[in-house]
């Protein structure tokens, strides 16, 4: 006999998630992801996954939760807002079109590493359910395994996948993390949350304003062009033809979200762990370029930024300094950094590019 939750218990779970864990929303979904297989396979066929080989591996486990975690009968899906400042589309568009010497870091990385924050909350939620039922077997995921978080959230009625492939929600916008619990509970008898209709309509804002043209038809992202991929997941050289377009974005890119009309109303997070770290936000590029590896380790402790490593961090900043308004100090700082990376050809290549770019701007 499968373990179930009563409607009253399910309400207790939702109340605990919102009130005690500060999660933004919670729902449940079944395990049938078959409708998403053609979409995913087409994305792979187009080579939009770049060199992310883990997106190819694991076979059917990505689409059949019970294969990844045997005994899974249902999926519990939760979201957690991370937006730490108001967004106004008109203001953002103007800012994004203005060149500056200030580093641009994706909002999600301003605070504590979301993997740690979200997983801790989901684990507490799973344990709370176990207290209610006894025998609750579960495993939590947040962007860390072959799990289709966005499709599962869409099935759970927490939003729709927009043209940017981000999960959208009229009330929450898109600035939220998604976490899931693969559970042995049978939640099929509980009422489903109503599905969200795709409300993007004819809007093309994210497509038109993507700096590198990474947003493709069919709600697909070409990772090979995506600045988030290029500055975070990419371990090698950033393609020459895309360097100018990266601007001063040194870690990730929020452009497709910042220009989305639904984010005009996105709520500000109340999660303390996601508040801005002063030493990462609105910082002059040269100040960050001057960091030593020891500084990098110190200031990125507990941050998702730590994952890319110091060399990639300097690689990214070099591109941004090259793209910033001309200043002789930029060239001097880049030349000085070359001494530190004299045995690292990858970083040297980007430092040299930035120096030449600054000379062209002079």
Swiss-Prot record:
GO annotation, cellular component aspect: cytoplasm
4Fe-4S ferredoxin-type domain ranges (all copies): 191-220
GO molecular function: 4 iron, 4 sulfur cluster binding; epoxyqueuosine reductase activity; metal ion binding
Residues that hold [4Fe-4S] cluster 1 according to the record: 200, 203, 206, 260
Top-tier EC class: oxidoreductase
Reaction equations catalysed: epoxyqueuosine(34) in tRNA + AH2 = queuosine(34) in tRNA + A + H2O
Catalytic residues, chain numbering: 143
Any one GO BP annotation for this protein: queuosine biosynthetic process
Protein name in UniProt: Epoxyqueuosine reductase
